[in-house]
Amino acid sequence: MAAKDVKFGNDARVKMLRGVNVLADAVKVTLGPKGRNVVLDKSFGAPTITKDGVSVAREIELEDKFENMGAQMVKEVASKANDAAGDGTTTATVLAQSIITEGLKAVAAGMNPMDLKRGIDKAVAAAVEELKALSVPCSDSKAIAQVGTISANSDETVGKLIAEAMDKVGKEGVITVEDGTGLQDELDVVEGMQFDRGYLSPYFINKPETGAVELESPFILLADKKISNIREMLPVLEAVAKAGKPLLIIAEDVEGEALATLVVNTMRGIVKVAAVKAPGFGDRRKAMLQDIATLTGGTVISEEIGMELEKATLEDLGQAKRVVINKDTTTIIDGVGEEAAIQGRVAQIRQQIEEATSDYDREKLQERVAKLAGGVAVIKVGAATEVEMKEKKARVEDALHATRAAVEEGVVAGGGVALIRVASKIADLKGQNEDQNVGIKVALRAMEAPLRQIVLNCGEEPSVVANTVKGGDGNYGYNAATEEYGNMIDMGILDPTKVTRSALQYAASVAGLMITTECMVTDLPKSDAPDLGAAGGMGGMGGMGGMM
C-alpha cells in the first residue's frame, strides 16, 4: 500500500480553502447578464468558450492534491445543482465559497465546527420555507419566455422559442435541442407519437417525392413476435382488404416470405400495407408496444398472454387518423384510443418515474409520457461557427432546464434579490448557543454573495448596490443588464424557485462538511528518481576494462 500524506487542523483547512477559491473564482466570473466568458482548452479541436458554470467547474483539476480535494468538493456542489434543477450552478458555487470562507474564519477563531454547521443548516431550512412562501406560479407563456431569456444569458429569441415549444407540446411534452443547419434558430414540432423505426422495405413508399409512406385512417397490427410465415397473417390481411383500409404492421421483425408477400400485395394494389420494427428492446419494447396499443385503441398480439396471430380480428387492431413513415421514423397521428385509457397509462408511467433509480431510465420514461400526452418539439440551434454552436447549445439546454424548473415550483425575483429578502425575513433566527448564532450569520451573509458577484461582474460597487436593494422591499432589486433599480418581476428578471432552492441547499450541505473537516489524507507523490541498479552494474564493467 502506498504511503500517505496526512494534514490536520488548520493546515488542512487552509489548503482546502485555497482549492475552493481557485475553482470558485474561475466559475463566478460567468455569473449574471454581464458575466465574462471562460475559454477551455481541449486536447483536440478548437477551444470551447462558455458561460456555463458547471462546464467550467468540470474542467478544473489542481496539481496539489490537498487543494484539489477542496476544488472537487465544490465541483460536487455545481454538479448536484445541475442534476437537480439543470441551472443555478454558478449561484451554488458562489454561495458555497462564501459559506466555506466565513465558516473557516469562525473555526479559526475557536468556534465549535459542529455548532456552526447546525446553525448554517437551521438558517438554510428556514430560508427554504421562506423561498417557497415568496414563490409565484409560472404558468403563462410570457413568464416562461422571461425565465428562458434570463437563463440563456439574456437571449430573448431563445426564451421565446422555449415558450412557444412548451405552448405547442404542453408542459409534459419532450423538448430536445439539436444542431441546426443555418444561422437562425428553428422550432420543429412533431404532432402525435413518433418513434425511431423506419419502413422495412422501400417498396412500401407511396409518396416518391418525399420518400415517405403515408397511410390514411389505417388499421394498426401490433405483434410482440417475429413474423416470417405469411399464413399466420392471412386472416387479418383478408379482413383488412374487405374493410378497404390500409394496414400498418408493427412487430419485432417481419422477414422472409412474409415481407415479400406484403410487398407484392402492396405493389399490385390488393391491400395497402407497410411494416416497421417495434421500437426499443426487451422489456422496454413490450412497454412501448403497449403504449402504442393504448394510443390507438388496439391490443398487442402476444403469445405470452395466449393470443395467436391467426386468430386476430379487426377488433384487436388499433386505428389512427394518419401514419407517416420515412426511412428513420414512424409517426402515428391522432390515435383513436380512449382518453381515459391514455390518462391511466400516463399515470402508471409517472409512478414508474417516481420509483426510477437511474437518470437514463427516468429520461426514457419521461419520453414515453410525452409521446402519449403531448408531442415532441425540437429546437434547432443556428450559429455561424462550431465554437459558437457548442456555446449556444449549452445555453439553450440550460434555459430549457430552468423553464421546466419554473413550471414545476414557480418563480421568485431574480438577480439575487430573493435570497436578500429571505435573509432579512429570518434575520431574527436564533440558535441554541452563541456558536450556532454565528453559523446562522454565516449563512445569512452568504445569501448576499450572488447579488454582490452579479454587481461586481458589471463593474459596479457591490456594497452600494447591496445596501440599496436591502433598503427596498418586495421585488425591488437591481437590473444588472440595464444598470437600473426597479421591480424585478415587472422587468422580467425571474429565477425558478427550484434553482435558487437547490443552489442554497447543496452549497450549505457541502460547505457544512468542509467546515467540520479536521484531517485530510492523500497519497504521497511518487518519487521520479531513476533506478540505480542498472547503473551500478555498468560501473563494474568499466573496472573490468581497466584490468585488461
UniProtKB/Swiss-Prot annotation:
Quote the EC number.
Answer: 5.6.1.7
Protein name per its UniProtKB record: Chaperonin GroEL
Alphabetized UniProt keyword annotations: ATP-binding, Chaperone, Cytoplasm, Isomerase, Nucleotide-binding
Q: Which reaction does it catalyse?
A: ATP + H2O + a folded polypeptide = ADP + phosphate + an unfolded polypeptide
Describe the PTM: UMPylated on a tyrosine residue by YdiU under ATP-limited conditions.
GO cellular-component terms in the record? Answer: GroEL-GroES complex
Principal location listed in the UniProt entry: cytoplasm
The GO terms this record gives for MF are: ATP binding; ATP-dependent protein folding chaperone; isomerase activity; unfolded protein binding
